[in-house]
Amino acid sequence: MVHAVIPENRDQYRDALLQMHRDRKTIFVDRLHWAVPVVDGEFEIDQFDTEQAVYLLALDPRSHRHLGSVRLLPTLHPHLLGDVFPDLCAAGVPRDAGTWEITRLCTTPGLEKAEARAVLGLIATALVEFALLYGVYRYTCVAHLQWLSQLIAVGWDTEPLGAPQQIDDELVGALSINVTPATLQM
């Protein structure tokens, strides 16, 4: 089951959020070698993990263990694309109340491939449901070209925001994803 962690219920998910930050450190720092902040040697927490951030957490229904997650940021507040990678957008960074950014999508290290795919599917559905419930009509994201290709392959209505650029020996691009009720059927 996927839980939407919003400012009003964040205290109820304290343990799950710590697990998420621990898993993010394992994936993004230990495996992918990203130069991002690490708190207390075990938690990947950056400047965008603020009160405005919303987290969609896939949790094991019995143990409530973190299985996967994504961070959502309203683009009217500081966010990765707008504050770190604005050059990835040819016509400027999209910023409005109905545009949110997807960042830090991950699954728990050690999941079998089939289970990780299932968790990502649950998170994808939750992204669309969250958008429809909260008036989000567009998501933006920054990702390595391989991830962007996988997002496009899902069949969602996507648009590149600019040409991919070489950043730290990787091709990185920005993408927008238009969300409508029909997106749930994809």
PLM feature spans:
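Acyl-donor binding region in acyl/amide transferases
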Residues: 80, 86-172, 177-181
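Short, hydrophobic/aromatic-rich beta-strand segments within well-structured domains
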Residues: 56-58, 71, 127-128, 140
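Short, solvent-exposed loop/turn elements at beta->coil junctions and helix N-caps
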Residues: 40-47, 162-165
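C-terminal catalytic domain of photolyase/cryptochrome flavoproteins
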Residues: 182-186
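Short amphipathic alpha-helix that is part of the acyltransferase structural core
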Residues: 1-44, 57-62, 66
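Short, His- and charge-rich active-site/binding loops that engage polyanionic ligands
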Residues: 59-92
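Short connector loops at helix/strand junctions that flank enzyme active sites
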Residues: 51-53, 67, 95-100
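A short helix-loop-beta-strand connector motif used in the catalytic cores of GNAT acetyltransferases and
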Residues: 47-57, 80
